[in-house]
């Protein structure tokens, strides 16, 4: 599968198949033009649930869900206000706050960078949380921000990360899909740190990727399928955040020995304060 979120969703799908005994089928559309076609084709099969991954499906699903009121749908990363649609969203700003704390405390230059894919409201959540976390941990830090305009242009990601590094950023966080692989490549080639996103990307450059802001699309997919099996599906919006393990940091598999315990403790402290409500991370979508 070409997309990080799709790959994570597939894990959740296979988990549901194994543990819940459901039959599953899936397709990864080649382009936006195919999305409505696939949604309608699956609805025509009379499936118990049709799940679409990503905000780019939203406009098509508004139309399709209205045309198939007897079919249950779910969408990841956007909201469709329809009685037969369950919207699965994440508190990406909260998870990004945690990796921002890490970056703010680990930076030796007091400059860190953020590279986004498309400049859309969803990716603003990552940017906002990261900047707030970095400045919470280190009020003197400066956050450099650039958008690539694409989720599939590693060359542009590499170019922007190198530019930020040349301007002083020694840690760069990406929320850029496939474009982000260029950010990680640039970090390896130029000797600065990167922070991955969505899945655990630490393996892509052990010791260079400090951590990843993990977003458990697999968990969301599994849970919505389970609710169908259990007969508890209610539609509406379901949000996954730090408290329920929907977002968070990766396990620092390759970097735990490089990161001071005081920094790891600060991340845990921030996590606890977000859960308790003592820290409220800004959500640009609200």
Where are the language model's segments positioned?
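A residue-level marker of the well-folded mature domains of exported/periplasmic proteins
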Residues: 1-286
């Amino acid at each position: 599968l070409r997309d990080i979120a799709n790959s994570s969703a597939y894990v959740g799908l296979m988990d549901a198949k194994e543990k819940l005994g459901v039959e599953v089928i899936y397709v990864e559309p080649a382009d936006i033009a195919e999305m409505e076609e696939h949604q309608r084709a699956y609805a025509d099969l009379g499936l118990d649930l049709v799940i679409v991954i990503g905000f780019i499906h939203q406009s098509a699903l508004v139309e399709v869900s209205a045309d198939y009121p007897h079919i249950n749908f779910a969408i990841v990363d956007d909201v469709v206000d329809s009685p037969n649609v369950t919207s699965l969203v994440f508190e990406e700003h909260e998870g990004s706050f945690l990796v921002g704390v890490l970056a703010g405390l680990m930076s030796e230059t007091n400059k860190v960078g953020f590279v986004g894919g498309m400049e859309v409201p969803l990716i603003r959540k990552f940017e906002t949380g990261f900047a707030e976390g970095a400045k919470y941990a280190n009020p003197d830090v400066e956050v450099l921000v650039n958008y690539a305009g694409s989720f599939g242009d590693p060359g542009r990601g590499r170019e922007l990360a190198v530019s930020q590094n040349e301007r002083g950023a020694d840690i760069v966080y990406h929320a850029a899909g496939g474009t982000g692989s260029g950010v990680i490549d640039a970090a390896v080639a130029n000797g600065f740190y990167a922070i991955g996103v969505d899945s655990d990307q630490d393996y892509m450059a052990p010791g260079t990727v400090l951590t990843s802001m993990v977003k458990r699309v697999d968990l969301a997919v599994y849970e919505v399928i389970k609710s169908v099996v259990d007969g508890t599906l209610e539609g509406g919006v379901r949000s996954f955040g730090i408290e329920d393990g929907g977002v968070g940091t990766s396990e620092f598999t390759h970097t735990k020995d490089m990161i001071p315990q005081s920094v790891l403790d600060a991340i845990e402290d921030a996590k606890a304060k977000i859960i308790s409500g003592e820290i409220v991370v800004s959500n640009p979508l609200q």
